[in-house]
Amino acid sequence: MAFGSLLAFVALAAITRAAPTAESAVCPDGTRVTNAACCAFIPLAQDLQETLFQGDCGEDAHEVIRLTFHDAIAISQSLGPQAGGGADGSMLHFPTIEPNFSANSGIDDSVNNLLPFMQKHDTISAADLVQFAGAVALSNCPGAPRLEFMAGRPNTTIPAVEGLIPEPQDSVTKILQRFEDAGNFSPFEVVSLLASHTVARADKVDETIDAAPFDSTPFTFDTQVFLEVLLKGTGFPGSNNNTGEVMSPLPLGSGSDTGEMRLQSDFALARDERTACFWQSFVNEQEFMAASFKAAMAKLAILGHSRSSLIDCSDVVPVPKPAVNKPATFPATKGPKDLDTLTCKALKFPTLTSDPGATETLIPHCSNGGMSCPGVQFDGPA
């Protein structure tokens, strides 16, 4: 399928909505929804925004977005139901088990942050809470799509087994096989899900540095990560020889402004013949990337459940902040000469400009450009 046709198909799939039914209702706050069951998520969204995210695409939002993936991907067709139930909220139901798996290192922050909401909004299952909180979190990131949200996942009774979460040191083959086993994800869908790395940072790959971003714009949902992973690496933002990390093109930091980290898995997926063209196709294609991510997330978020058994409550997901009106650009001091050898020869690489500046880009630690960020941390068992 040509990429132009693929773009149109993905965009259509991403915006499809269930038609209003006879069960449509008006919630106590006046919001009209397709089903009365969706009303319970309106106060939850308000509580999450005011108490946890504070309307910011910051660390608390980033961590909950990560949690949606780690909770959902823990399912296996080959191992069977006892391996895990997918998007089942088991991270919250078993907060002293799954968060302690090595691949989930650091996820206890988001688990502990959501546990008070699970107790307060106790008519909502933990499984629904995790996926809805992720959709609310993403809405704070300029340029993000408005995610689909299906409600009605039951509470789980068992934790997932260890070993189902892809890790940055895994080979491309192992990653693709894991996604295939989890839910028949195609290589294109795998790359689409990695758009989440444009609003992601790492604390545990290199524990000598805090909140290392994966691109130069970690507070906006844009295509920079797909460009910057294609640049030649020049150094590490912290120590070297860390498992799952390779050299980054923007390692320079200053104070709490940490340099860019490059995951070994991102590097490999951007260069592997099975995925390189998909990776490259997202560079400077904001709408295509956002629509592709939305479609892949719709599939991920219901792993372990039948779509027909769930209720479409997408209309209570907050409308995301608009995209920043800026195309993909090479960071200051970088240009076409800094591109690594491109594996994908079928696509013409877009013509991009470089940001002005004679020194390497410093990536701000906080979305407000400062060094002190708003944040919430609840105590919990994880």
UniProtKB/Swiss-Prot annotation:
Mn(2+) binds at E59, E63, D203. Residues 1-24 form the signal peptide. Catalyzes the oxidation of Mn(2+) to Mn(3+). The latter, acting as a diffusible redox mediator, is capable of oxidizing a variety of lignin compounds. This is Manganese peroxidase H4. Glycans are attached at N100, N155, N241. PROSITE patterns: PEROXIDASE_1, PEROXIDASE_2, PEROXIDASE_4. The keyword Cell wall biogenesis/degradation does not apply. Ca(2+) 1 binds at D71, G86, D88, S90. InterPro entries: Ccp1-like (IPR044831), Haem_peroxidase (IPR002016), Haem_peroxidase_sf (IPR010255), Ligninase (IPR001621), Ligninase_C (IPR024589), Peroxidases_AS (IPR019794), Peroxidases_heam-ligand_BS (IPR019793).
